[in-house]
């Protein structure tokens, strides 16, 4: 595993879970965290520890977004009508980087963020280079014409390890995706259990 790949799996190692369900994740081979003390048996987590871990998993899945940005997203979810945890999932899944990743235009969420930053993506026909850009139902995301033959894109489309969720309609021949609806927690194909209700409890302390 290259140094770059290893860095991407740091979150997996820290949490002790393969949060993206990737075959090369180091936690597929061991059940302890990174570092010289990683093999020590972990004690039972406190309620706070359980809530913190749930937050770290959700933050980590979306590319380890900053605490400031994650809390801002939570606060927006809390202001909206309905279940705050479900609102949080909907907001996270409507991020441009999440949709580019879910559409299988790139292999990882980290690659999605870089891909967007480098200007390879259009939304409704206009280039957008902000990874946290919030999509609305019906928005069309497309790999820019000059970027469609990039190796990273051609390889990602063929990945068998994950499927495109049904709230994103994708044409892989044209490399176009439509964000068709806001998903609920049960719609989202997480590789591990995500518990947004515990994230709500964490911020409600």
Curated annotation (Swiss-Prot):
Keyword RNA-binding among UniProt keywords: yes
UniProt keywords, alphabetically: Ribonucleoprotein, Ribosomal protein, RNA-binding, rRNA-binding
Keyword Membrane in record: no
Domain annotation S4 RNA-binding: ranges: 94-157
Top-level taxon of the source organism: Bacteria
Cross-referenced Pfam families: Ribosomal_S4, S4
Record-linked SUPFAM superfamilies: Alpha-L RNA-binding motif
Recorded GO MF terms: rRNA binding; structural constituent of ribosome
GO-annotated cellular components: small ribosomal subunit
A GO BP entry: ribosomal small subunit biogenesis
Subunit structure: Part of the 30S ribosomal subunit. Contacts protein S5. The interaction surface between S4 and S5 is involved in control of translational fidelity.
HAMAP family referenced in this protein's UniProt entry, alphabetically: Ribosomal_uS4_B (MF_01306_B)
Function noted in UniProt: One of the primary rRNA binding proteins, it binds directly to 16S rRNA where it nucleates assembly of the body of the 30S subunit. With S5 and S12 plays an important role in translational accuracy.
Name recorded for this polypeptide: Small ribosomal subunit protein uS4
Organism lineage: Bacteria, Pseudomonadati, Pseudomonadota, Alphaproteobacteria, Hyphomicrobiales
């Amino acid at each position: 595993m290259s140094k770059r790949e290893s860095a991407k799996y740091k979150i997996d190692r820290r949490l002790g879970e393969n949060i993206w369900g990737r075959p090369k994740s180091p936690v597929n081979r061991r059940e302890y965290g990174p570092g010289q003390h990683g093999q020590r048996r972990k004690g039972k987590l406190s309620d706070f520890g359980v809530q913190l871990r749930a937050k770290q998993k959700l933050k980590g899945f979306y590319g380890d977004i900053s605490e400031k940005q994650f809390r801002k997203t939570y606060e927006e979810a809390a202001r909206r009508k309905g279940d705050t945890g479900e609102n949080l999932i909907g907001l996270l899944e409507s991020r441009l980087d999440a949709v580019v990743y879910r559409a299988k235009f790139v292999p990882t969420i980290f690659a999605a963020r870089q891909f967007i930053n480098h200007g390879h993506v259009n939304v409704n026909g206009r280039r957008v280079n902000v990874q946290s850009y919030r999509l609305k139902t019906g928005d069309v995301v497309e790999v820019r014409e000059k970027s469609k033959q990039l190796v990273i894109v051609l390889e990602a489309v063929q990945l068998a390890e994950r499927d495109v969720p049904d709230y994103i309609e994708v044409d892989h021949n044209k490399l176009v995706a439509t964000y068709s609806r806001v998903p609920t927690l049960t719609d989202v194909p997480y590789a591990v259990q995500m518990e947004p209700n515990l994230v709500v409890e964490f911020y409600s302390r």
